[in-house]
Amino acid sequence: MQVWRIAAHPAEPNTIFAGTSPSALFRSRDGGTNWEKLTVDLAETCPNVRFPRVTALEVDPTDHNIVWAGVEVDGVQRSLDGGDTWTRISGGLSDPDIHGMAISPGNPKTVLTSTPREVFTSTDTGESWQGLGVGQHFSMPYCRDILVKKDSPDVIFVATGESPFGVTGNLQRSKDRGQTWETMTLPAVPNTPMWAFASNQADPNFILACSHYGEIYSTDNGGDRWEKLPREFTEIRGMAWTPN
């Protein structure tokens, strides 16, 4: 079993969710010392990848009872009770190959989901989805994770790459909820597709982005300038920032 995604509760730092491959969801209420496996109807097999895996986990920043999970390749799951029960959500979501999810707390509150070639949005808690048509904007069309800036719901970041096995990647930013996009200038050429994001709840301008093969980039001004951390890791599946 591999851990592919983690998410920290916005108000209860000891509550952590984890998603794995093969696909399963776990929850800890004591900072990760003990874990319980959650009851979720997830696929055991799927096309294109050997085992389905949880590639997205989000806790709603304003209604903490709503938790989202995205599965590659098994669509979106939603919990309305903090992870106790789950429902598969699919209306209008044409691709079940989920790579990332994010929540924009603006008016209206918007849930965003990234798939290999598209970013979808929902303003009705996942009952229906609309595509943004990002393929016409991105120079590297393969999409992985997605992040919404905590204090600016119109600002969206997407981690992209050439292909699932590409040799490099980049970061895209939109300041108008996905209508237009710009490519971020990074201090080095990433060694694989860019893969995942993490952000600081207390300082929304501080954002981390990683490549699949262990490079981590940081910005302290909301994406205008990026630095590469000197330390590198092996494969990175996901990141999360906790206040303690």
PLM feature spans:
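Extracellular glycan-interacting surfaces
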Residues: 1-244
